[in-house]
Amino acid sequence: MKRITIIAALAGAGILAGGAALYFSSGTQEGAPRRALWLPAEAPTKPAWTARVTPLAGDGGNGVVDGALAASRFSDPFGVALDLQGNVYVADGGDSNRIRRVKPDGVVSTFAGGREGFADGVGAAAAFHTPSALALDRAGNLYVADTGNHAIRKVAPSGSVTTLAGDGQPGYQDGVGRAARFNGPVGLAVDRDGNVFVADTYNDRIRRIAPDGTVTTVAGNGQPGNADAPALAAGFDTPTAIAVDKKGTLFVADTGNDAVRRIEADGTVTTIARPLENDPQPILRRPSGLALTGDGYLYVASGAGGRIVQIAPDGALHALLDVDRPPEASYGSDGTVRLYAPRGIAVRRDGSLVVADTQALRLFSLAEPKKGEAAPPSQSPVIRHSASMPWPVGPQQEVHEVVGVMGEVRGSYDGESRHHFHAGLDIRADIGSRVLAVLPSKISDPFPNWGFGSLGEGMSLGPFSYIHMRVGREANGKALDERFQLLLDARAKPERVRVRRGARFAVGDALGTINPMAHVHMDYYPGGAVVNPLTLPFVGLRDTIPPTIQGIALYDAAGKRIRPARKGQPLRIERAQGDVNIVVDAYDQMDGNLARRRLGLYKLGYQVLHADGRPVAGFEAPLITQVYDRLPREREAVKLVYADSSGITVYGSKTTRFAYAVSNTMQGGQALPGSWKVGNLAPGDYILRIHAADFAGLVATEGRDLPVTVE
């Protein structure tokens, strides 16, 4: 094993820039000769550049598999660091609890750790608990924010792991080495003098570990807050990443405040970036990773929303663009890079980035596209869960009523009837009953829950989000157990719940209690993208009821409805109209549903037949236009696949109407406009047959045919 030790740097840059540099590699054994190595200059950073996102390591499945890049697996890839030989070090939490290494030759291996625990040692003899951020010093030592152990660990080039500070217990205490205490530290950085700066996440403070091991507090008053002020008077809310420049200025990803903060050498804290108020889709949301370039650019991983934000030295802020997702119409991509849950970022010498995505369970490379280079696959494979799945409410081994499925249109509380797609599965439960974990999982997101006291309150755990519950609280408001920390306001009233990264939950553990929505909503995102939860084999779930078609309507290209036919007569369409839009009013039900229940469909399309039932050429089988296995990430796409007569304006007992714009397409999570090309048909009588199917494969047979005459 070899590492590089810096002995010279041009222009005094903390990250080399501006010219070539001479380094020496350290030998694998004491006394071994060192080899001189010239490195090329760090490339100057391009403002607002366009990237190609390419999978670097991991296949999207959860596990611990070393070996070739594409076959490797991670459990919770979080922090990343690059050494001067091009090795990528990865802090892999979850059930892995390892420091992994990705070599330039394309092989993933384990560098240190291998079990959950708190133990020093060499290689696999060492133990970590949910390692998070990584940082390398100038001597090649790797520092680890060992979140679940409330400690900072040091890995020597030989693979020997020692504890730099912290004693394995949560708390707040300055001191030397193990006499100091942290509370779930997630972020860290090392300056050129060997000082280690720590984002002491759940203490809401920034700490410093001097080269002699002395721990002191740099900034933060110890309470979640949002205050620019000198040093210990400043307020942070769950800081999770930190970076330091060559002048000693610190930059902090202040996750709970959706902000990036700066700490000057004198301790003064200011805010350099945060979203505009009332911005419904900010590019900077829940920042959780930082990386500095040698020429002063700062990259920020927006943990919610998935964007990679570049902040220039002059303060200009841009989301990196994605060459393979150019801006589309109002219903499509905005053109920016959209990962799933980006965390750690590292900058290569050529200016490209390595990003760890905990939700996608992969490492990605972001680089300028090369001429003639093919675009990578746009989707991760869906890893099927084959074992029987318990329900998220009790009794977990008995069937419960499904009251909402993926892909349904949903309205907003302020009157918009087509506000967003329903992204998961709704399971009815009594208000106050407990929501239960369905898979053994650890908390990955440092800020995993949201919406305290609101109807949309929820928490992410493993590949799921559990929503519409009082997170971590009984119906009477008391905390369920010590994994949930109630934070109090100035009147000693609970104002939020804090759940640490690394908290572990077994199947059946209580996560919260049902709020007045009277159901729990589950989003499911194995490998990153939201997937239909009906792919999970829930115990006893049955569907023997085919969908119901309530009506079929046609609209011209201007959106005007074509006059319905008189009873017993075909609907007449002028061939000159060319493009016609098809809207189908339909719904589904499952076994056990109340009579009033309306569920959305899984697959829709249409077929054109001659009057005698023979398929028109090109329509030998139904043309499938919409499949609700994945959903677009752009919220406005809901207005493309649902007609404006869809939805409801408020939640509650009102019936939702699903008016599908069947001539528009929704495939593979991408929505595109379309139409029925009646201009391609010869004049005559036809049958427009709607294909409406549910996830079980049952197809509507009644009300599916609309006789038409093309004139």
Please provide the spans of the model-predicted regions:
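Conserved beta-propeller blade signature
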Residues: 87-89, 141-143, 195-197, 249-251, ...
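Short loop/turn segments immediately following the C-termini of beta-strands
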Residues: 93-94, 147-148, 201-202, 255-256, ...
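A short loop-to-beta-strand structural motif that recurs across blades of beta-propeller domains
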Residues: 97-101, 107, 150-154, 160, ...
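Surface-exposed, glycine-biased beta-strand/turn segments
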Residues: 370-465, 472-477, 494, 498-510, ...
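Long, low-complexity serine/threonine/glycine- and acidic-rich segments characteristic of extracellular
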Residues: 500, 506, 542, 557-710
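Gly/Pro-rich loop segments of beta-rich domains
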Residues: 42-78, 107-132, 160-184, 214-238, ...
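Blade-level signature of beta-propeller repeat domains, shared across WD40, Kelch, NHL, RCC1
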Residues: 339-377
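Residue-level detector of Asp-centered blade-edge/turn motifs that repeat once per structural unit
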Residues: 82-85, 136-139, 190-193, 244-247, ...
